[in-house]
Regions:
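Short, well-ordered strand-loop elements centered on a beta-strand within folded domains, enriched
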Residues: 63, 167-169, 183
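N-terminal lobe of the biotin/lipoate ligase/transferase fold
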Residues: 1-155, 206, 238-281
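A hydrophobic, small-residue-rich beta->alpha segment in the mid-to-C-terminal subdomain
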Residues: 180-223
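Short, conserved beta-strand/beta-arch hydrophobic-aromatic motifs that form part
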Residues: 70-73, 158-175
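Short, structured patches in soluble enzyme cores that scaffold and shape functional sites
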Residues: 107-109, 162, 173-177, 199-202, ...
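Flexible, glycine/charged-enriched surface loops at secondary-structure junctions
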Residues: 139-143, 224-233
């Protein structure tokens, strides 16, 4: 949360583009940022959570969610023999694929700053993806099945986890991904369903880089927040991946000035929420 010059509370989300990265490395980054939120909620003195939207393009990987009983060690070996990694996760949902040409978004948010409801959160992700597709002239929708669909073809997946309304994992949108990877699995456990992409639906090449701006503007509108992003230098990115120092260091002075502003602001009846100010990309 940030405070504008006229003392209006504004939700601010950092956007950090991790580029192309393996699944485990990106997972570690988001989990450590989620821990900052949880430690702050637990009252740990030096912990300050930051609302962050991580964007990443994964190297080939199959991941399974909590309902993974149908996938055996033999299945894992078979999928890894294709040249992909394979991991079990604590997100909701069944098996899916991530790889080059797919935009993956991991919002690490304290939903107390938005709406403390996982149902609302999933709906907000769905609407963000639908609006992104609309920007490419594609009519997408939700169905009784998970994810976002173009008619009966799945173009985006959602699999999230929440702890004390702190979110991890997120969603993925197929841009120009190689759809052959999906032929080796039953995506999200849905038999007889086709997987599609922006490239396939539009009939022209849509590189992943072209999906970032439409996705971010859709996210900003649906989540009713401001986005802050700065390009990190190589050494800053490496430091971000290995520890929390980059965010913590950049936030200290800003948070102090925001708190000083808040003490002189008109009293807010529900001002128990932590104040978070954010610069990052």
């Amino acid at each position: 949360i940030s405070i504008s010059s006229d003392f209006v509370l504004v939700r601010v989300v950092n956007v950090i583009n991790l580029g192309r990265m393996g699944y485990l490395r990106a997972n570690d980054v988001q989990m450590r940022h989620a821990r900052q939120h949880l430690d702050e909620l637990a009252g740990k003195p030096s912990s300050k959570g930051t609302n962050v939207l991580f964007l990443v393009e994964h190297t080939p990987v199959y991941t399974v969610g909590l309902r993974n009983q149908q996938y055996s060690h033999e299945d894992a070996f078979r999928l890894k023999s294709l040249g992909a990694e394979y991991y079990k996760t604590n997100r909701g949902g069944l098996i899916t694929f991530h790889g080059p040409g797919q935009l993956v978004a991991y919002p690490v948010l304290n939903l107390q700053h938005f709406k403390p409801s996982m149902k609302w959160y999933i709906s907000a992700l769905e609407n963000t993806l639908i609006k992104t597709c609309q920007k490419f002239g594609i009519t997408a929708r939700t169905t009784a099945d998970t994810g976002v669909w173009v008619e009966d073809r799945k173009i985006a997946s959602i699999g999230v986890h929440g702890s004390r309304f702190v979110t991890t994992h997120g969603c993925s949108l197929n841009s120009n991904i190689d759809l052959n990877w999906y032929k080796h699995i039953i995506p999200c456990g849905l038999h007889g369903k086709e997987v599609t992409s922006l490239t396939k639906e539009t009939g022209q090449e849509v590189p992943l880089s072209d999906t970032i701006s439409p996705f971010l503007s859709s996210f900003q509108e649906i989540f009713d927040c401001d986005l802050e992003y700065n390009l990190l230098e190589a050494h800053e990115m490496e430091e971000l991946i290995t520890n929390q120092h980059v965010l913590t260091q950049r936030m200290q002075n800003i948070q102090q000035s925001v708190r000083q502003m808040s003490t002189s602001a008109v009293h807010q009846p529900q001002a128990a929420e932590p104040i978070i100010a954010n610069p990052m990309w």
